[in-house]
Curated annotation (Swiss-Prot):
Keyword vocabulary terms for this entry: Ribonucleoprotein, Ribosomal protein, RNA-binding, rRNA-binding
Function description: Forms part of the ribosomal stalk, playing a central role in the interaction of the ribosome with GTP-bound translation factors.
GO BP annotation list: translation
CDD domains reported in the protein's UniProt record: Ribosomal_L10 (cd05797)
SUPFAM superfamilies listed in its UniProt record: Ribosomal protein L10-like (SSF160369)
Species assigned in the record: Neisseria meningitidis serogroup B (strain ATCC BAA-335 / MC58)
Similarity field: Belongs to the universal ribosomal protein uL10 family.
An example Gene Ontology molecular-function term: large ribosomal subunit rRNA binding
UniProt xrefs under PROSITE patterns: RIBOSOMAL_L10
Listed name of the protein: Large ribosomal subunit protein uL10
């Protein structure tokens, strides 16, 4: 499908805007994937707040020029789907988890903090809990001593009330 120059410029601007605030950009090959699988992948990405797009590699290379993802341009070969997210692990997690279900999605590379990652490093990044999960775990750890102290005080109050009644 041939795109005219204005359509290409609009696409590059849209992609540049989408990745401007992204911490992570992950690319995966999608050769031979069914429409229903791609629709499911897009739905998963939307749910996790991941910008997911299939586009020409030349347009993607232009969009990443001058960004922290510029080093990833060498990896942009073949039919690729691009996933970008503000959450450092969301894009990697969405593509990695979907690749486990559908072998037609193959994670090729990614970029985080200006560093290019291979597929194994993207898988490692995907295994890290999200920011929300880490915050909830931290909150639980911080609440545990306080709630234990409160339960101890309540038990002591019950014991004192039981002794006074007897």
């Amino acid at each position: 499908m041939s795109l005219n120059i204005e359509t290409k410029k609009v696409a590059v601007e849209e992609i540049s805007a989408a990745i401007a605030n992204a911490q992570t950009l992950v690319v995966a090959e999608y050769r031979g994937i069914s429409v229903s699988s791609m629709t499911e992948l897009r739905a998963n990405a939307r749910k996790e707040g991941v910008y997911l797009r299939v586009l020409k590699n030349t347009l993607a290379r232009r969009a990443v020029q001058g960004t922290s993802f510029a080093e990833l341009a060498d990896q942009m070969v073949g039919p690729l789907v691009y996933a970008a997210s503000e959450d450092a692990v969301a894009a990697a997690k969405v593509l990695h988890q979907f690749a486990k279900k559908d072998d037609k999605i193959v994670v090729k590379a990614g970029s985080y903090n200006g560093e290019v990652m291979n597929a194994a490093q993207v898988a490692e990044l995907a295994s890290i809990p999200s920011r929300e999960e880490l915050l909830s775990k931290l909150l639980f750890v911080m609440q545990a001593p306080v709630s234990g102290f409160a339960r101890g005080l309540a038990a002591l109050a019950e014991k004192k009330a039981g002794e006074e009644a007897a």
